[in-house]
């Protein structure tokens, strides 16, 4: 497969929801929101509802299944052009009933077979947001990625998101801060 697996993209998209709502990132409500307990490596695993929201981000025409074309659109939006050639292989591995599409059951099964979220997924997610490759994520970069994914947010909103995670007060999110946020049980 490619360096950007089907499951890494699921993870990246599932986390965008939290980046848009920084006030909920560390709330006690999230502790009892249906998230399962931490998985391997101590990382919180998404609930079925979160996975359904991720699935719907891929299912652009809302027909209950993901086509290869829809999957490629998401790859392009994430700047992962190199991975497009691997889409047929990904679908061959995930499309268990052989109908040429990935339905929600197959989507969940693929996630479960992968063992959930890995630290490499979190690092790859960081680099998706770090558009200029300087090792830090700015509010402008967050806004750019979210806009590419069809999420409309203001620069002010993105600044609040960054401040919610920025432990050292430099106005940017570094890898350590990003990993701490993503691996928190309260995410």
UniProtKB/Swiss-Prot annotation:
Give the molecular function GO annotations.
calcium ion binding
Q: Name one Pfam family in it.
A: EF-hand_7
**GO cellular component term, pick one:** mitochondrion
List ligand-binding residues for Ca(2+) 4: 166, 168, 170, 177
Where are stretches of biased composition, namely Low complexity?
Answer: 32-47
Q: Which parts of the sequence are annotated with region: Disordered?
A: 21-47
InterPro entries (UniProt xref): EF-hand-dom_pair, EF_Hand_1_Ca_BS, EF_hand_dom, EF_hand_pair_protein_CML-like
- Indicate yes or no for the key word Calcium: yes
What are the binding positions for Ca(2+) 3 in this chain? 130, 132, 134, 136, 141
Tell me the residue numbers annotated for binding Ca(2+) 1.
59, 61, 63, 65, 70
Record key words, sorted: Calcium, Metal-binding, Repeat
Look up keyword Transcription and say if it applies: no
Give residues annotated as binding Ca(2+) 2. 95, 97, 99, 106
Q: Using the record's annotation, list all stretches that form the EF-hand domain.
A: 46-81, 82-117, 129-152, 153-187
Record family assignment: Belongs to the calmodulin family.
PANTHER family documented for this protein: EF-HAND CALCIUM-BINDING DOMAIN CONTAINING PROTEIN
Q: What is its biological role?
A: Potential calcium sensor.
This chain belongs to the protein called Calmodulin-like protein 30
Which organism was this protein described from? Arabidopsis thaliana
């Amino acid at each position: 497969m490619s360096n950007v697996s089907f499951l890494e993209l699921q993870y990246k998209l599932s986390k965008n929801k939290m980046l848009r709502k920084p006030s909920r990132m560390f709330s006690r409500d999230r502790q009892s929101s249906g998230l399962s307990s931490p998985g391997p490596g101590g990382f919180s695993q998404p609930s079925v509802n979160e996975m359904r929201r991720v699935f719907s981000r891929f299912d652009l025409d809302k027909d209950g299944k993901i086509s290869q074309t829809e999957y490629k659109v998401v790859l392009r939006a994430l700047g992962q052009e190199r991975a497009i050639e691997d889409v047929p292989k990904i679908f061959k591995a995930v499309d268990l009933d052989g109908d040429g599409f990935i339905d929600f059951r197959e989507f969940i099964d693929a996630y479960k077979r992968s063992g959930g979220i890995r630290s490499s997924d979190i690092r790859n997610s960081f680099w998706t947001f770090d558009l200029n490759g300087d090792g830090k994520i700015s509010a402008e970069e967050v806004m750019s990625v979210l806009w590419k994914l069809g999420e409309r947010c203001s620069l002010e909103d993105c600044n609040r998101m960054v401040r919610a995670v920025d432990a050292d007060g430099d106005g940017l999110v570094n890898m350590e801060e990003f990993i701490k946020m993503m691996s928190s049980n309260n995410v």
